[in-house]
């Protein structure tokens, strides 16, 4: 790991957050899925943000490290680590690590730094991260150009339920689903990420950046 005291988060870098389970093991399909996606993110010279822990967080940081083969690739892997008594292993290949005692503070940093949010399969913590992002997107506390990419078929039932229950009962609006994308492979995920990156790279002075908007 590089000296985290000397590294600073570059506000001009495009960053992709990946949320997912700490319980997923190497060799599982989802681990490889996240590893491959993170590698592509690095190859496209985008920063990665993860929880900096085991499981899919580890898959993300390892994949991102593997993708930085170009000499002038200046992308970074950022770990926002929550201190838990049962989850002490820190992910490898983090360039910058921030430690948190409270989930709320950690989530706020994720929101401030992320240009795209990718949600891999996970449990209560991952679902919290998904709905926290979704809620802030709905009320425009973060930029309304942030895509939420859901990886794998696990999320299909949840989105079906959101349509059949809250949407049908008019508890949410159709537009609340506009930024939700279900994908099962890396290419469509990267297509969405690259579209967002293209908008970011235009450098329009009016482009919404969470690092400026979310406090």
Regions flagged by a language model, labelled:
Residues 26, 86-88, 156-159:
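Short, charged/polar "capping" segments at the starts of alpha-helices
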Residues 20-22, 51-52, 80-83, 100, ...:
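Fold-independent oxyanion-binding glycine-rich loops
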Residues 92-93, 100-182, 189:
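Conserved phosphate- and dinucleotide-binding cores of soluble alpha/beta proteins
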Residues 55-119:
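Acidic/glycine-enriched connector segments
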Residues 1-20, 179, 184-215:
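SAM-dependent methyltransferases
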Residues 1-79:
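Glycine-rich beta-alpha loop segments
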Residues 34-35, 65-66, 133-137, 164-167, ...:
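Short, solvent-exposed amphipathic alpha-helical segments in soluble enzyme
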């Amino acid at each position: 790991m590089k000296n985290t005291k000397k590294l600073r988060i570059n506000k001009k870098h495009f960053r992709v957050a990946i949320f997912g389970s700490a319980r997923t093991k190497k060799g599982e399909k989802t681990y490889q899925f996240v590893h491959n996606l993170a590698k592509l993110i690095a190859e496209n010279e985008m920063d990665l943000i993860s929880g900096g822990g085991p499981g899919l967080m580890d898959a993300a940081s390892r994949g991102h490290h593997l993708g930085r083969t170009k000499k002038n690739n200046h992308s970074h892997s950022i770990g926002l680590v929550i201190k838990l008594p049962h989850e002490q292993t820190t992910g490898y290949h983090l360039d910058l690590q921030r430690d948190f005692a409270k989930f709320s503070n950690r989530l706020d940093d994720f929101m401030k730094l992320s240009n795209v949010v990718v949600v891999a399969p996970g449990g209560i913590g991952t679902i919290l991260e998904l709905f926290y992002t979704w809620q802030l997107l709905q009320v425009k506390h973060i930029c309304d150009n942030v895509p939420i990419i859901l990886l794998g078929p696990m999320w299909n039932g949840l989105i079906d339920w959101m349509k059949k229950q809250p949407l049908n009962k008019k508890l949410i609006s159709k537009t609340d689903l506009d930024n939700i994308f279900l994908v099962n492979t890396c290419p469509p995920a990267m297509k969405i990420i690259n579209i967002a990156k293209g908008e970011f790279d235009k450098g329009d002075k009016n482009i919404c950046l969470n690092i400026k908007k979310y406090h």
